[in-house]
């Protein structure tokens, strides 16, 4: 089984890639970390989108895990247009593009699995992270729509919406926010960040 994972050089993506059986096709930005995989593509989503598309179509992908993500903590009246573009591109446009390139093969074999890593912020909204929340909410909506399109082809698509996760992205998000980690943990029913392996 050929499994494509974005954001595979760290955090949730790296943990998923290390724990799945199958042939992993790892996508990320850190070549040193990606070298642990037999098949990998160093990819900057701003510059390498055509290369990414060719990589997907040439490798007959059975399973897609859209995990790569960007986060910014800025109130709505302080965010710049380039910041908006970057988050929407990485968190919504690129997953849609990847799916569009993977679906023809999945449809041809009448089987496929797509998992998008969303966020609880896309479900509830997060003050101070409006564009992040919007991008993840869009990912959830896109997932629901595509699920209706591909159901008869025996292809499933779902979104996992974690809360705070003990990753570089999660911890950097705390540093950027106005809240301490302890204050955030007090709002989590488990009273802790989850580990990537729990996703």
What are these regions (language model features)?
Residues 75-76, 83-88, 184:
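Substrate-binding pocket helix/loop in short-chain dehydrogenase/reductase
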Residues 77, 124-131, 152-153, 191:
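Active-site loop immediately N-terminal to the catalytic Tyr-X3-Lys motif
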Residues 119:
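Residue(s) in the substrate-gating loop at a strand-loop-helix junction
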Residues 188-199:
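A conserved structural motif in NAD(P)-dependent oxidoreductases
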Residues 9, 17:
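N-terminal Rossmann NAD(P)H-binding glycine-rich loop of SDR-like oxidoreductase domains
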Residues 99, 135, 143:
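Active-site helix of classical SDR
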Residues 104, 148-152:
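Alpha-helical segment proximal to the catalytic Tyr-Lys
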